[in-house]
């Protein structure tokens, strides 16, 4: 099925300036420390594969994509507009065993 309408960006969905919450700032700091410095993002158009391990069945599969992607962009100095394809998976895990897996490859 195809809908002939320009997609709305997250930025276009909200009015006014948005600020990072203290919880997001803490999350960003923790992720930046956990991500390996040696990871290299290839040049050109990219594909990202993400797998989120949630402990709640109610977690939406798409909610963590943009915050995590923005952190990857910051850590590895690339523009996420280069991502042309994404594969996203959700897995339910025990509380305390939550995780994020990712891989960025050239198309």
Task: Outline where the language-model segments fall.
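Acidic, proline/glycine-enriched N-terminal capping motif
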Residues: 1-107
């Amino acid at each position: 099925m195809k809908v002939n309408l320009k997609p709305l960006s997250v930025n276009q969905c909200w009015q006014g300036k948005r600020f990072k919450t203290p919880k997001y700032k803490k999350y960003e700091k923790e992720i930046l420390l956990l991500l390996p410095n040696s990871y290299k993002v290839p040049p050109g158009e990219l594909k990202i594969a993400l797998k989120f391990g949630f402990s709640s069945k109610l977690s939406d599969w798409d909610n963590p994509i943009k915050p995590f992607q923005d952190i990857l962009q910051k850590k590895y100095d690339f523009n996420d507009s280069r991502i042309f394809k994404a594969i996203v998976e959700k897995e339910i895990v025990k509380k305390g065993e939550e995780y994020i897996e990712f891989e960025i490859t050239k198309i």
